[in-house]
């Protein structure tokens, strides 16, 4: 992590470098929870050797402007990268997030799962690229994003790209974006909950998987408290 620099609000810069060596197993947890005057610049790079298994968990809850880039080079055969990410954008937050997954090794695997929620006048752009290089035969890459919009003014943009220099690879993109299902909300409310409580229950169900991966109960509590604060 790099220190904050003062100016028109704070700027927080973070650079993360991950090296999954041969046959290694690595877990990384990246948490961003800053106030509304903070601009966040994130750069994450992962390099995976043969049979390396790397899991990255990301939590983005706050910051007036977030610019985040994650790049991974799956260099080794049977290298395996999993990324699970959650974000909650609100007020006038601006999120610009990019993922680049480059497959080089044979039978390499990448799996990107993103769950987001947006409210007020927040804006988010997500760019994701799966690139199967020549020599990455029998590899598999998957990218999935699910976004819940809690207001008409919130805007979500997704730009997926799939590139392939091999024939026998599998690349999948999936994205869903929309408001909460009214029938589901009505059903939950019929159990005695308010609408706000019903909405919170649905949002929490999307976030609970990555949050439960944290071993530190203090960090878990801080993240859940931040989600509750954003819901209002």
Question: What residue spans do the PLM features occupy?
Answer:
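Residues on the solvent-exposed faces and adjacent turns
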Residues: 20-22, 30, 48-50, 74-76, ...
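Acidic, glycine-rich loop-and-beta core segments that form the ion-binding/anion-interacting portion
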Residues: 35-103
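Beta-strand-rich extracellular passenger or scaffold domains
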Residues: 6, 26-30, 54-58, 83-84, ...
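Single conserved hydrophobic/aromatic residue that forms the stacking wall/gate
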Residues: 1-12
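Family-specific signature for flavin-dependent thymidylate synthase
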Residues: 103-232
């Amino acid at each position: 992590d790099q220190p904050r620099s003062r100016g028109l609000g704070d700027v927080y810069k973070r650079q993360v470098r991950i090296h999954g060596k041969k046959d290694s197993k690595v877990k990384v947890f990246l948490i961003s929870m800053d106030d509304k005057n903070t601009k966040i610049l994130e750069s994450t790079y992962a390099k995976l050797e043969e049979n390396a298994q790397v899991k990255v968990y990301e939590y983005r809850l706050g910051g007036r402007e977030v610019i985040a880039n994650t790049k991974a080079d799956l260099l080794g055969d049977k290298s395996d990268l999993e990324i699970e990410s959650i974000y909650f954008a609100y007020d006038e937050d601006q999120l610009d997030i990019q993922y680049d997954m480059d497959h080089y090794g044979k039978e390499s695997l990448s799996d990107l799962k993103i769950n987001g929620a947006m409210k007020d006048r927040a804006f988010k752009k997500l760019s994701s690229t799966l690139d199967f290089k020549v020599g990455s035969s029998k590899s598999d890459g998957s990218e999935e994003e699910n976004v819940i919009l809690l207001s008409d003014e919130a805007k979500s943009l997704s730009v997926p790209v799939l590139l392939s220099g091999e024939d026998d690879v599998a690349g999948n993109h999936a994205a869903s974006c929309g408001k909460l299902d009214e029938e589901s909300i009505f059903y939950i409310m019929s159990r005695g909950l308010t609408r706000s409580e019903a909405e919170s229950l649905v949002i929490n169900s999307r976030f609970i998987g990555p949050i439960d991966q944290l071993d530190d109960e203090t960090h878990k509590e801080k993240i859940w408290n931040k989600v509750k604060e954003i819901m209002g």
